[in-house]
């Protein structure tokens, strides 16, 4: 056979539309009028989704881990045969966050009520794994200060209300150490201005970091992540 333009064929290709389409939605359970009264039934290995809180006026926390260049999402949240069955159990998975880099990270994060991650270039490369943002969120990570980010992981951090910042001067990376206490005063203005002045309380120094976000991404961060943002917007 050959490809033929149907307009050149002497064939009636008209289709008569029915007066109405039969719709059977009897198998669809309509949402309750008051969703607050609905109980979500979860299996023993399915835990509630972690949701961040709206951003406050100031951001402060200790450096929970300092990593080098090209940290992958698999470094951040390993996904091997032992952990895959727990993909819906973020509390359990978080115990293995950065497990291949620093086994003490989860414990350190809990002891300090969360904090900040410091990283080199291309942080979050590789798989677009959302768990690499969800596990740090569950452990209280508020921001990641890196030399540069992999694009998709940066988007996942924003969606979870974790602020991605980039060192203005890469040499400042060497001036920050593990468990240094960092403070960003008036972080709300820093988001709008696209630049944060960060005080290292531990050694008394200051350094700057860019916050390259769109207007919508800023609103998402302020809301504490995309779920909160959507809830606010209705």
What do the predicted segments below correspond to?
Residues 1-234:
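Fe-S-dependent hydro-lyases/dehydratases of central metabolism
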């Amino acid at each position: 056979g050959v490809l033929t333009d149907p307009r050149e064929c002497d064939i009636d290709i008209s289709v008569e539309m029915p007066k109405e389409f039969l719709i059977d939605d009897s198998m669809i359970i309509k949402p309750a009028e008051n969703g607050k009264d609905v109980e979500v039934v979860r299996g023993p290995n399915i835990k509630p989704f972690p949701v961040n809180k709206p951003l406050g006026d100031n951001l402060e926390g200790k450096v929970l881990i300092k990593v080098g260049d090209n940290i992958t999402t698999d470094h951040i949240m390993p996904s091997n045969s032992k952990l895959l069955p727990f993909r819906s159990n973020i509390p359990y998975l978080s115990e293995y966050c950065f497990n291949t880099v620093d086994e003490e990270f989860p414990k350190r994060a809990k002891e300090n009520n969360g904090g900040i991650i410091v990283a080199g270039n291309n942080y979050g490369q590789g798989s677009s794994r959302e768990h690499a943002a969800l596990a740090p969120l569950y452990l209280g990570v508020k921001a990641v200060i890196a030399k540069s980010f992999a694009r998709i992981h940066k988007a996942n951090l924003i969606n979870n209300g974790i602020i991605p910042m980039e060192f203005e001067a890469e040499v400042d990376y060497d001036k920050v150490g593990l468990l240094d206490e960092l403070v960003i005063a008036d972080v709300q203005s820093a988001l709008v201005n696209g630049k944060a002045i960060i005080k290292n309380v531990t050694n008394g120094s200051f350094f700057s970091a860019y916050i390259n976000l769109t207007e919508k991404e800023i609103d998402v961060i302020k809301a504490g992540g995309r779920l909160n943002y959507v809830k606010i917007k209705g």
